[in-house]
Amino acid sequence: MSDENGPSKVDLQTAMRKMRALPPNKLCFDCGARNPTWCTVTYGVFLCIDCSAVHRNLGVHLTFVRSTNLDTNWTWLQLRAMQLGGNGNANQFFKAHGCNTTEAQQKYKSRAAQMYRDKLSTLCQEAQRKFGTQLIIDTVTHAEEKPAEEEDFFAQDFGHTSASATSLSSDAYIADHKSEDSTHGPSVDHLDSSVAVPTSAPVSVILKKPIKKATLGAKKNALGAQKVRINFDEIEQRAAEKERQTAAEVAANKLAYQTELDGKKKSDDAAALQKLSAKFAMQDIDAQRKQMEAKVAKDPTKAASVDRLGMGGVGRSRAAHSVAGGIRSIKQDDVLTFKKPSQPKEDDDWEVIDDKYGKKSTNNEDDFFSKDYTSSSSKKTTKEDDFFDSFETQPVQKSRYTASSSSSSTSRAPTTRLTAGASPISDVDLQKKFGNAKAISSDMYFGTPEMDCETRSALTKCEGQTSFGSEDLWGNGSQQRQSSQVPDMSDLKDSFRAGASKVAEKWSTLSSSFSTYMSRAPPATGEKT
């Protein structure tokens, strides 16, 4: 069913199916591709999808492209252009006007394209006025009504219909002539019937020959199939032999590479072992000792030089460890006793701690200033000493260097000594005894828990204290550090000055005491009698 604006979808599909069934419309107008589904309503030709893209680039002022399957909103003028045009009519018109190019820009901008576009538009307007909304139109009758004097494409294309008209007229003439004598001649009853005589389509006259379809497969020659003269067994045998040779070469190369790799690895291991032995391996001392003994036995004159230079380890310990021989336990032959180091008399260049007063100096003035006169008064038993003791005397203080030196000499920390008779303890017993201990002392290790009298007296002084250090226990920490310091000359000068002033004060006290004593002296024994 159709309307005034355009054909319906069903009518459009019917008309397109009928137009695509024509042989010229089965190929693309530009490239010749099969089954085109696009068209340009400006020229009324069918195109493929690739050529439709080219027409879109040309612009709608030259060509307007539409799809025959997807677009459904066609107008009657567009449908008339496809019905009156076609690929066959367009090809013939372009060839007649000398347009044989395949380039789209030149082809559709040429003079022939403009003339064909204008002519097709005029024919569409006339057919629309005559047929209106009729879907199927008679293009043959429409072509016959054209003036004969116009010799153009459409007149030439549809000129063959004149033969049909001539045949019809002659038939009609024959029918009229025979009607006078109805008893003779052929029957012409079909002329009076209302059924129209079918005529061939004018488009079929345009085609010279039907287009042949290309067939798949190879083209057969006149000779036909021939027998192959190739020995496939020989080819297969040569291929198998080639594979065996290749496999043998690969195996030989692999074996040679593995052998070379193993040799290189062994050489590297030997070099590494030699380097390690040169660096870290210890020589066997017993073997060297035997060699040296053999040399000494041959030449007795070498014994003195060997003992003097200590070569070969002769006379030394015969037990040693070796990397190759492993580690073994060595038993100690004897236990060495520790000797108390002798205290040097001179601690520094300034003072010597030796005498009972705590200091021995090379200068007589130092001995004079460092004497304590109050300590000697307790040893005197004469009356003169008792007399001097009755007076108050100021004690002379010792110099700080003398006191520090005397304290450092008299308060040395006792140390624990090993007895010569202590028996050595084996490693197994020590491991059993101290295996789980976190810390051990030398007394626990050597088994000497007894303390000497000096240590016991020092510990007695620190009883009752919560904490004490080595300085509190032995009393020599700060004094030893002070005595080891070198005194400054200014300090010595001050000390000498203080000592001189104290001596002068002492002499002044003694002289005043002696004067007082003489003034209070008792009368002589001769006067009493």
From Swiss-Prot:
Record has Cell membrane as a keyword: no
Compositional bias, Polar residues, is annotated for: 476-487
Q: Which SUPFAM superfamilies match?
A: ArfGap/RecO-like zinc finger
**Pfam families xrefs:** ArfGap
Q: Where is the Arf-GAP domain?
A: 13-129
Q: Note the zinc finger regions (C4-type) by start and end residue.
A: 28-51
Task: Show the GO MF annotations.
Answer: GTPase activator activity; zinc ion binding
What highest taxon heads this organism's lineage?
Eukaryota
| Keywords of the record | GTPase activation, Metal-binding, Zinc, Zinc-finger
Is Iron-sulfur among this UniProt entry's keywords? no
User: Low complexity bias located where?
Assistant: 399-420
Gene Ontology annotations of biological process type: COPI coating of Golgi vesicle; IRE1-mediated unfolded protein response
Q: Where is the composition biased (Basic and acidic residues)?
A: 291-301
Q: Which GO terms describe its cellular component?
A: Golgi membrane
The region called Disordered is annotated at 291-313, 335-357, 398-424, 468-493
**Functional summary from the UniProt entry:** GTPase-activating protein for the ADP ribosylation factor family.
Q: What is this protein called?
A: Uncharacterized protein F07F6.4
UniProt source species:
Caenorhabditis elegans
